[in-house]
Every structure is written in structure tokens, then in C-alpha cells.
Amino acid sequence: MQLAQMLISLLRTSLIAISLVLLSSLSYASTIGNVVLQEGIASVERKGTESDLKLDSDIMFMDNVKTGKGEVGITFIDDTNVAVSSQSSLIIDDFVYDPNSAKGSKLILKVALGTVRYASGNIAKLNKQNVDIRTPTARIGVRGTAFSMTVDEIGQSLIILLPNAEGSVGEISVESDIGQVILTQAFQATSVRSREATPTKPKILDLTESMINNMLIIRPPKRRKIWKLLRLKIKRKRT
């Protein structure tokens, strides 16, 4: 009896291991999204090879999406949307989507450089804990909303909470290795200089959404640019 139970246990363990390997291989090889907007120069680095991105191009697990003087819009199969602005780099570190399993779904994105806008899809609705958005200096916890991230050449990050397509606003957490802040209001912003620095106190941008796009996108990110923006263009929300 004990021998039979041991054999059944070993068989179950083997089946689980095989399933995980197959799922990993499937995620790596399968299309997880598509380019829905493409203007100017854009490319994708995949398995060490770089190729041009065009409208309807497939997006896959571990892709590094890069833009020059152009921009790319991507819709993932769970309806997550990202907009990669000019002179930017977005890395898809992990993506698994099972519409019937909150635990089995996961999304990890890394903004390495430039400006990227994010709008939550079904993975965040299934389990917001399974969405992990990162920059070199910050980690953003998503709670069903939209926001933008701008990263300069040395990793300093500016994160801005935005209204979603319906006009409502959720919230996000922004954390470094030593501190965390919560953004809850439209156009609220925080900046993170390094992983060892506390995110700045949230402030309200005195800007419209289109102004944010123009100010943060028209030129390649420059060192300290985002700090000048914070000093000169951000003010506390009027009461």
C-alpha cells in the first residue's frame, strides 16, 4: 500500500514538472500581443536578433521593444495596453495569461529607458498582485489603472498616475528598496533617484495629459531632465 502511494506521488510530481516545462516553452514561443500602433522607427530584439516592428507584428515573451524617432502601441492578449514613446526600451520579463486562473496569470514588464504608458488589462483584474512593473530604480504595484513612467540614462524614474479610458482613477504603489508611496489622484507624480533613495512625496502635475506626452516624449531622455520638470512644472494640488 505504501509503495503504491509513493508511486502515485512520484507520478504526480513528474506530471507537474512536465506541465511547468511545457508551459514555459509555450509562453516563450507563443504570441502574447500585437502591435496596434506603429509610427517612425521601432524594432524588437528577440533571442539576440533585432528586427523592425510593423503594424500587426507579433509580440512574444522576453521581447525587448525599442523605439528611435517613433512610437509603438501594443495590446496584449489579456487586453493590457502599453504605449512605448520615442527613444524608449520596454522589456517583457514574464507573461502568462489564463483567464480561468488568478494564480496562473502573471505580467512583469521593465521600462529600461524613455517613456512608457500602461493601462491595466484582465491580468490585473484577476489578481493585481500578479502585475509587476519595474524601472531600474522603482517597482510599481498596479491596482487597476493607467500611469506613465519616464526613465533617464542613469535609471532615475518619474511615475505619473493617469485617468483610465473611462476617466476614472485607480491607484498605484511606487517603491524603492527603502521606501514606498501611494498615488491616488489623477496626474499625481513621484520620482525615484536610486533604489537606495525614498520615492519623493507625491505632488500633482499642473498639466493635461497631452502636455505630459509632449514634454516627456519629444526628445531623448536627458540626465536630470525629470528633476527639472519636477522643480519647474509640478506644484501641489490647489485646495
Range-by-range predicted roles:
Residues 30-48:
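Short N-terminal segments immediately surrounding and downstream of signal-peptide cleavage
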Residues 46-61, 66-71:
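N-terminal post-signal-peptidase region of extra-cytosolic proteins
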Residues 52, 56, 81-83, 89, ...:
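Well-ordered beta-strand positions in beta-sheet-rich domains
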Residues 65-72, 84-133, 163, 168-172:
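Short, small-residue-rich packing micro-motifs
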Residues 79, 86-89, 136-137, 144, ...:
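Tight coil/turn sites that cap or link beta-strands
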